Each structure stands twice: as structure tokens, then as C-alpha cells.
């Protein structure tokens, strides 16, 4: 099944999502847009199993990483974004 992983510019570069991913889909890459100088990236999205552990690990009020399963459309699920 094909999943889409979106990383938003609200990422604070904390690496929580990267450490939470059981299949190493995510990695940190250099980015000057935040204090930490890095942002999450999803270069191996084909390995995403849709567990959404990255979403759960994200400490920001506005989830910086979102996983959309297959044909799932953008929906709030009670979360601000």
C-alpha cells in the first residue's frame, strides 16, 4: 500500500519522529529554517508501514509530520494543522 509522508515547516528539528520510526523512513537533513538547523525528511517513504508512530512522537502543537494512508484524504482527526 502506498502512503504519503508530509513534513511541514513547523518541524523544530528535535529528531523524535526519526527515532520513533521502526522502518527508518525518516532522516534529518540540513535546513536553515529552524533553530536546530535541521528538518525531518522522508527519503524512504516506500518503506512506510503506516503505523503513525512519527505523528505520536511529534512534540509540536501543530503536527510537523503526517502520514496519509493510501487514498486517505487530509482530515483533522481533532488536530490543528
From Swiss-Prot:
Binding site for [4Fe-4S] cluster 1: 11, 14, 17, 58
Main location per the UniProt record: plastid
Molecular function, one GO term: metal ion binding
UniProt-annotated binding residues for [4Fe-4S] cluster 2: 21, 48, 51, 54
Cellular component aspect of the GO annotation: chloroplast thylakoid membrane; photosystem I
Statement: the UniProt record of this protein carries the keyword Metal-binding: yes
EC number: 1.97.1.12
GO biological process terms held by the UniProt record: photosynthetic electron transport in photosystem I
Top class in the EC scheme: oxidoreductase
Membrane topology annotation: Peripheral membrane protein
Complex and partners: The eukaryotic PSI reaction center is composed of at least 11 subunits.
Annotated PANTHER family: PHOTOSYSTEM I IRON-SULFUR CENTER, PHOTOSYSTEM I IRON-SULFUR CENTER-RELATED
Protein name: Photosystem I iron-sulfur center
Classification of source organism: Eukaryota, Sar, Stramenopiles, Ochrophyta, Bacillariophyta
Amino acid at each position: 500500500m502506498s502512503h504519503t509522508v508530509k513534513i511541514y515547516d513547523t518541524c523544530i528539528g528535535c529528531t523524535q519522529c526519526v527515532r520513533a520510526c521502526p522502518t527508518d523512513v525518516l532522516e534529518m537533513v540540513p535546513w536553515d529554517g529552524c533553530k536546530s538547523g535541521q528538518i525531518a525528511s522522508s527519503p524512504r517513504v516506500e518503506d512506510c508501514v503506516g503505523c503513525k508512530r512519527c505523528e505520536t512522537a511529534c512534540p509540536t502543537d501543530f503536527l510537523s509530520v503526517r502520514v496519509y494512508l493510501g487514498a486517505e484524504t487530509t482530515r483533522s482527526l481533532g488536530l490543528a494543522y
